Amino acid sequence: MPENSRIVLASASPRRLELLASAGIEFDVFASDIPEEPIPGEAPADFSVRLAKDKAVATAARSEGRWFIGADTIVVCDGEIMGKPADGADAVRMLKKLSGVPHEVITGYAIYDKARDGILCKAVVTKVFFKPLRDEEITAYVATGCPMDKAGAYAIQGGAACMVERIDGSYTNVVGLPLCEVVEDLRTMGAL
Protein backbone atom coordinates (compact mmCIF):
# COMPACT_ATOMS: atom_id res chain seq x y z
CA MET A 1 0.00 0.00 0.00
CA PRO A 2 1.52 3.39 -0.93
CA GLU A 3 2.65 5.54 2.00
CA ASN A 4 0.10 8.25 1.16
CA SER A 5 -2.88 5.88 1.13
CA ARG A 6 -2.28 3.78 4.25
CA ILE A 7 -4.99 3.14 6.80
CA VAL A 8 -3.85 3.40 10.42
CA LEU A 9 -5.78 2.04 13.40
CA ALA A 10 -5.16 4.42 16.30
CA SER A 11 -5.66 1.77 18.97
CA ALA A 12 -3.78 -0.86 20.94
CA SER A 13 -6.95 -2.93 21.38
CA PRO A 14 -6.40 -6.49 20.16
CA ARG A 15 -10.16 -6.80 19.64
CA ARG A 16 -10.31 -3.82 17.29
CA LEU A 17 -7.26 -5.12 15.43
CA GLU A 18 -8.89 -8.56 14.99
CA LEU A 19 -12.19 -7.07 13.83
CA LEU A 20 -10.61 -4.78 11.23
CA ALA A 21 -8.34 -7.59 9.98
CA SER A 22 -11.35 -9.92 9.68
CA ALA A 23 -12.79 -7.52 7.08
CA GLY A 24 -9.73 -8.11 4.89
CA ILE A 25 -8.49 -4.55 5.31
CA GLU A 26 -4.77 -3.82 5.19
CA PHE A 27 -3.78 -1.39 7.92
CA ASP A 28 -1.04 -0.36 10.31
CA VAL A 29 -1.42 0.04 14.06
CA PHE A 30 -0.20 3.06 15.98
CA ALA A 31 -1.55 3.23 19.51
CA SER A 32 -2.82 6.56 20.74
CA ASP A 33 -2.27 7.82 24.25
CA ILE A 34 -4.76 10.47 25.28
CA PRO A 35 -6.53 11.16 28.59
CA GLU A 36 -9.89 9.41 28.78
CA GLU A 37 -11.93 11.55 31.16
CA PRO A 38 -15.40 12.94 30.43
CA ILE A 39 -15.99 16.67 30.56
CA PRO A 40 -18.57 17.48 33.28
CA GLY A 41 -22.04 17.35 31.73
CA GLU A 42 -20.81 15.68 28.53
CA ALA A 43 -23.31 13.21 27.05
CA PRO A 44 -21.97 9.63 26.82
CA ALA A 45 -22.13 9.46 23.00
CA ASP A 46 -20.42 12.86 22.72
CA PHE A 47 -17.71 11.66 25.11
CA SER A 48 -16.96 8.50 23.12
CA VAL A 49 -16.93 10.41 19.81
CA ARG A 50 -14.66 13.12 21.25
CA LEU A 51 -12.16 10.51 22.43
CA ALA A 52 -12.27 8.72 19.07
CA LYS A 53 -11.63 11.99 17.24
CA ASP A 54 -8.80 12.95 19.59
CA LYS A 55 -7.18 9.53 19.12
CA ALA A 56 -7.37 9.69 15.32
CA VAL A 57 -6.07 13.26 15.04
CA ALA A 58 -3.30 12.80 17.65
CA THR A 59 -2.10 9.64 15.92
CA ALA A 60 -2.11 11.34 12.52
CA ALA A 61 0.17 14.04 13.90
CA ARG A 62 2.72 11.41 15.00
CA SER A 63 2.70 8.87 12.18
CA GLU A 64 2.59 8.32 8.44
CA GLY A 65 -0.59 7.36 6.64
CA ARG A 66 -3.69 8.79 5.01
CA TRP A 67 -6.73 7.54 6.94
CA PHE A 68 -6.68 7.25 10.72
CA ILE A 69 -9.35 5.32 12.62
CA GLY A 70 -9.90 6.21 16.27
CA ALA A 71 -12.46 4.47 18.47
CA ASP A 72 -13.61 4.45 22.06
CA THR A 73 -16.11 2.10 23.66
CA ILE A 74 -18.00 2.81 26.86
CA VAL A 75 -20.80 1.14 28.77
CA VAL A 76 -23.63 3.28 30.15
CA CYS A 77 -25.94 2.02 32.89
CA ASP A 78 -28.39 4.26 34.75
CA GLY A 79 -26.49 7.32 33.54
CA GLU A 80 -23.09 6.10 34.74
CA ILE A 81 -20.33 5.97 32.12
CA MET A 82 -18.34 2.82 32.76
CA GLY A 83 -14.89 2.63 31.27
CA LYS A 84 -12.31 0.04 32.27
CA PRO A 85 -12.43 -0.95 35.94
CA ALA A 86 -9.77 0.53 38.23
CA ASP A 87 -9.31 -2.77 40.08
CA GLY A 88 -11.06 -6.03 40.94
CA ALA A 89 -13.43 -4.39 43.41
CA ASP A 90 -14.48 -1.87 40.77
CA ALA A 91 -15.07 -4.71 38.29
CA VAL A 92 -17.30 -6.48 40.83
CA ARG A 93 -19.21 -3.23 41.44
CA MET A 94 -19.78 -2.71 37.72
CA LEU A 95 -20.96 -6.26 37.09
CA LYS A 96 -23.34 -6.12 40.06
CA LYS A 97 -24.81 -2.91 38.65
CA LEU A 98 -25.24 -4.51 35.19
CA SER A 99 -26.79 -7.68 36.64
CA GLY A 100 -30.34 -8.20 35.40
CA VAL A 101 -30.68 -4.78 33.77
CA PRO A 102 -30.35 -3.45 30.23
CA HIS A 103 -27.51 -1.09 29.44
CA GLU A 104 -25.99 0.59 26.41
CA VAL A 105 -22.64 -0.02 24.80
CA ILE A 106 -21.56 3.04 22.84
CA THR A 107 -18.62 3.07 20.48
CA GLY A 108 -17.63 6.40 19.08
CA TYR A 109 -15.43 6.23 16.04
CA ALA A 110 -13.68 8.75 13.85
CA ILE A 111 -12.06 8.36 10.45
CA TYR A 112 -9.62 11.19 9.78
CA ASP A 113 -8.45 11.85 6.21
CA LYS A 114 -5.08 13.50 6.78
CA ALA A 115 -4.64 14.48 3.12
CA ARG A 116 -7.91 16.44 3.03
CA ASP A 117 -7.97 17.39 6.72
CA GLY A 118 -11.49 15.99 6.89
CA ILE A 119 -13.04 13.84 9.57
CA LEU A 120 -16.14 11.68 9.84
CA CYS A 121 -17.36 10.92 13.38
CA LYS A 122 -20.20 8.70 14.55
CA ALA A 123 -21.49 6.91 17.62
CA VAL A 124 -23.10 3.48 17.43
CA VAL A 125 -25.31 2.30 20.29
CA THR A 126 -26.12 -1.32 21.11
CA LYS A 127 -28.49 -2.27 23.92
CA VAL A 128 -27.28 -5.24 25.98
CA PHE A 129 -29.46 -7.24 28.35
CA PHE A 130 -27.69 -9.12 31.15
CA LYS A 131 -29.34 -11.97 32.99
CA PRO A 132 -29.39 -11.68 36.79
CA LEU A 133 -25.91 -12.68 37.98
CA ARG A 134 -25.05 -14.59 41.14
CA ASP A 135 -22.27 -13.18 43.34
CA GLU A 136 -20.17 -16.31 42.81
CA GLU A 137 -20.45 -15.91 39.00
CA ILE A 138 -19.21 -12.36 39.26
CA THR A 139 -16.37 -13.28 41.61
CA ALA A 140 -15.24 -16.18 39.42
CA TYR A 141 -15.32 -14.04 36.27
CA VAL A 142 -13.37 -11.19 37.87
CA ALA A 143 -10.80 -13.72 39.17
CA THR A 144 -9.98 -14.64 35.54
CA GLY A 145 -8.58 -11.12 35.02
CA CYS A 146 -10.56 -10.81 31.78
CA PRO A 147 -12.68 -7.82 32.88
CA MET A 148 -9.75 -5.59 33.75
CA ASP A 149 -9.15 -4.04 30.32
CA LYS A 150 -12.77 -3.97 29.16
CA ALA A 151 -15.33 -1.19 29.30
CA GLY A 152 -18.02 -2.18 31.78
CA ALA A 153 -15.78 -5.01 33.05
CA TYR A 154 -16.86 -7.61 30.52
CA ALA A 155 -16.05 -9.10 27.13
CA ILE A 156 -19.10 -10.38 25.26
CA GLN A 157 -16.84 -12.50 23.03
CA GLY A 158 -15.29 -14.20 26.07
CA GLY A 159 -16.50 -15.66 29.34
CA ALA A 160 -19.16 -12.99 29.74
CA ALA A 161 -21.08 -14.38 26.77
CA CYS A 162 -23.05 -16.55 29.20
CA MET A 163 -24.07 -13.43 31.16
CA VAL A 164 -25.82 -11.85 28.17
CA GLU A 165 -29.46 -12.74 27.49
CA ARG A 166 -29.63 -10.74 24.25
CA ILE A 167 -28.49 -7.66 22.40
CA ASP A 168 -30.30 -5.16 20.20
CA GLY A 169 -27.87 -3.81 17.64
CA SER A 170 -24.34 -4.49 16.46
CA TYR A 171 -22.45 -7.36 18.07
CA THR A 172 -19.09 -6.02 16.82
CA ASN A 173 -19.93 -2.69 18.43
CA VAL A 174 -20.06 -4.44 21.81
CA VAL A 175 -16.71 -6.09 21.05
CA GLY A 176 -15.20 -2.66 20.35
CA LEU A 177 -15.67 -1.56 16.73
CA PRO A 178 -18.94 -1.37 14.76
CA LEU A 179 -17.44 -3.09 11.74
CA CYS A 180 -20.28 -2.71 9.22
CA GLU A 181 -20.48 1.03 9.81
CA VAL A 182 -16.71 1.59 9.80
CA VAL A 183 -16.18 -0.39 6.57
CA GLU A 184 -19.04 1.45 4.85
CA ASP A 185 -17.62 4.82 5.92
CA LEU A 186 -14.12 3.85 4.75
CA ARG A 187 -15.67 3.07 1.35
CA THR A 188 -17.60 6.35 1.31
CA MET A 189 -14.43 8.30 2.09
CA GLY A 190 -12.48 6.52 -0.66
CA ALA A 191 -10.16 4.55 1.61
CA LEU A 192 -11.37 1.19 0.22
Swiss-Prot record:
GO terms under biological process: nucleotide metabolic process
Site description Important for substrate specificity, residues in chain: 15, 73, 157
GO function term, MF aspect, one: dTTP diphosphatase activity
Gene Ontology CC entries for this record: cytoplasm
Keywords noted in UniProt: Cytoplasm, Hydrolase, Nucleotide metabolism
Enzymatic reactions: dTTP + H2O = dTMP + diphosphate + H(+); UTP + H2O = UMP + diphosphate + H(+)
Subcellular location: Cytoplasm
Cofactor(s), by name: a divalent metal cation
CDD domains linked to this entry: Maf
Enzyme Commission number(s) from the entry: 3.6.1.9
Domain of life: Bacteria
Family of the protein in this entry: Belongs to the Maf family. YhdE subfamily.
Function: Nucleoside triphosphate pyrophosphatase that hydrolyzes dTTP and UTP. May have a dual role in cell division arrest and in preventing the incorporation of modified nucleotides into cellular nucleic acids.
Descriptive protein name: dTTP/UTP pyrophosphatase
Species assigned in the record: Geobacter metallireducens (strain ATCC 53774 / DSM 7210 / GS-15)
